[in-house]
């Protein structure tokens, strides 16, 4: 990882810590490398399985939910998704057994899928940072699957050599091996410290959100974000701009693929 650091004023960060959703302590945001853990079943119904502790990312911000398994008493329950409601419900594959309430289980996130999504999510932050820095365009939409994604921008005209310039700039930022840091701040302090914190054309932060989680590609891009990320731009691997499409007057869609080993 690059030793490049950016001089910053002292910022009132909150230490990264596990987040609570309903009865479940979410483990994946404070430790994005965590792939397996012990937990206890609090509920198992047609709505899904509720654990006291979980590292399954439930989806959000364009990033799909994790897949994985629960292991208990020599039995395996495959998890095909996660649903956020008053609790965090793990959605088992149809026909798989449900562990009884009180059962001790070992949870395991599917590593290949999660790692691919982390690389893709960080790649989209890098892409939006480059397009904002070099062309002043904000994000108007986006979506991702493992190692491929789309991102829409409010870009009235396509600049000369736009595709090549974006691809070259992204490659340079990956080669620079910029650190990708995550921290949380009180909302007022976050916007005072980072006036350009929202890189979307519409502010999607809930108005009652008091603490903002921030993902910082050091020296390039700082955004409010609730997803999972790799630790440096080099870990993205490569970012190929596959296609540029017009999505109506003033809007462009970039389709990208994440390449390489990361």
Task: State where each predicted segment sits.
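Active-/binding-site microenvironments in catalytic and ligand-binding cores
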Residues: 1-262
């Amino acid at each position: 990882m690059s030793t490049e650091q950016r001089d910053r004023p002292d910022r009132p960060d909150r230490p990264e810590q596990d987040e609570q959703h309903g009865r479940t302590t979410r483990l994946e945001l404070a430790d994005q490398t965590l792939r397996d853990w012990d937990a206890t079943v609090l509920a198992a119904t047609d709505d899904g399985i509720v654990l006291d502790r979980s590292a399954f990312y439930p989806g959000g911000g364009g990033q799909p939910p994790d897949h994985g398994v629960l292991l208990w008493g020599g039995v395996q329950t495959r998890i095909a998704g996660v649903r956020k409601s008053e609790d965090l419900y793990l959605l088992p594959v149809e026909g798989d057994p449900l562990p009884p309430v009180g059962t001790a289980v070992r949870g395991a996130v599917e590593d290949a899928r999660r790692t691919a999504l982390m690389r893709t999510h960080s790649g989209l932050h890098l892409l939006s940072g480059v397009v904002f820095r070099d062309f002043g365009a904000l994000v108007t939409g986006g979506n991702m699957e493992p190692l491929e994604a789309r991102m829409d921008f409010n870009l009235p005209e396509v600049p000369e050599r736009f595709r090549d310039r974006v691809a070259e700039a992204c490659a340079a930022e990956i080669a620079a091996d910029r650190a990708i840091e995550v921290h949380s701040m009180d909302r007022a302090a976050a916007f005072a410290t980072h006036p350009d914190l929202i890189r979307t054309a519409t502010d999607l932060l809930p108005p009652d959100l008091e603490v903002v989680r921030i993902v910082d590609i050091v020296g390039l891009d700082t955004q409010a974000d609730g997803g999972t990320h790799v630790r440096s731009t080099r870990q993205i691997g490569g970012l190929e701009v596959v296609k540029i499409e017009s999505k109506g007057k003033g809007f462009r869609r970039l389709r990208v693929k994440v390449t390489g080993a990361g």
